[in-house]
Amino acid sequence: MPGWSCLVTGAGGFLGQRIIQLLVQEEDLEEIRVLDKVFRPETRKEFFNLETSIKVTVLEGDILDTQYLRRACQGISVVIHTAAIIDVTGVIPRQTILDVNLKGTQNLLEACIQASVPAFIFSSSVDVAGPNSYKEIVLNGHEEECHESTWSDPYPYSKKMAEKAVLAANGSMLKNGGTLQTCALRPMCIYGERSPLISNIIIMALKHKGILRSFGKFNTANPVYVGNVAWAHILAARGLRDPKKSPNIQGEFYYISDDTPHQSFDDISYTLSKEWGFCLDSSWSLPVPLLYWLAFLLETVSFLLSPIYRYIPPFNRHLVTLSGSTFTFSYKKAQRDLGYEPLVSWEEAKQKTSEWIGTLVEQHRETLDTKSQ
């Protein structure tokens, strides 16, 4: 295959950075354009220090700026779109999430058509499939089953509609007369070094004598390591550029999991951090059905107050459902079409993440010492 170029949106994020680390090892890749609204100074420095002969171009711009996106896409062979706002708590305004996650994706698709970019890979989420009820049980689900989120909450809704737009755009005619090929990857809940979620959990625990706050002791999920999700994106990029593989991939979506054991959100947090003295909150928890109806009451209060005051409930029905359901998926379709096999084993992923948590503990030891006095 001839030399090619790749644009990665959300490149300064948790997943985006890992994709870049793998992309620089790709043969025949001539240029990587890394795009984000703002890059942290340390992230920008890491990009400049990458040991590679591949040209790395750092671009700061807004995904809602259509003209900027069109310029960023000029001469690009593959777009990997990871940029998104992830919020299931209701802290970020609904319209902001819809603008970035849905409108931004639509803008990028149009930029690809105008700039004649032939391949588009969308980082979707398992949230587009559900769960829709804490009573729902999906074990090792797969793509042939019909699972679609019915939540109107901005994150799952925006990701679902963005994925639909991406898959519907497959086969669109490009400005140069070519054809746009698209696919979507639906990773499970992602863990690993530099995870913002894990970082927040650990820092919060350090402020509470090492007790991990409960985020879901009743659910069953299959978390996926960030390095394996990044690897799936690399394989999708290869696949869409391969004339033999592409017909089976374009217009398709894939669940991305790995060999991490099925467990609750609380269990994964504890397993990854117990080496550093963290423990689970042993206090009594309300049953999920009661939490669900309490969440409904809090959401009702929020709605009634909305004309005069923006009240953000401490939890909502969507969050309760996520933390109380059984919802796991197989990666067999990705294995079949993309040639996906987890690059990193569970044991290695656990070790790497635990070691990183150790560095967090070291950085915040002063906080821990102060609390324990």
From Swiss-Prot:
- Give the UniProt entry's GO cellular component terms: endoplasmic reticulum; endoplasmic reticulum membrane; mitochondrial membrane
| List of catalytic residues | Y155
List keywords of the entry alphabetically: Endoplasmic reticulum, Isomerase, Lipid metabolism, Membrane, Mitochondrion, Multifunctional enzyme, NAD, Oxidoreductase, Steroidogenesis, Transmembrane, Transmembrane helix
GO annotation terms (biological process): androgen biosynthetic process; steroid biosynthetic process
Q: Where does NAD(+) bind?
A: K159
Task: Quickly give the catalysed reaction.
Answer: a 3beta-hydroxy-Delta(5)-steroid + NAD(+) = a 3-oxo-Delta(5)-steroid + NADH + H(+); a 3-oxo-Delta(5)-steroid = a 3-oxo-Delta(4)-steroid; pregnenolone + NAD(+) = pregn-5-ene-3,20-dione + NADH + H(+); pregn-5-ene-3,20-dione = progesterone
Tissue expression from the record? Liver and kidney.
Stated EC number for the protein is 1.1.1.145, 5.3.3.1
Chain segments annotated as transmembrane: 288-308
Membership in a protein family: Belongs to the 3-beta-HSD family.
* Protein name per its UniProtKB record: 3 beta-hydroxysteroid dehydrogenase/Delta 5-->4-isomerase type 2
**Species of provenance:** Mus musculus
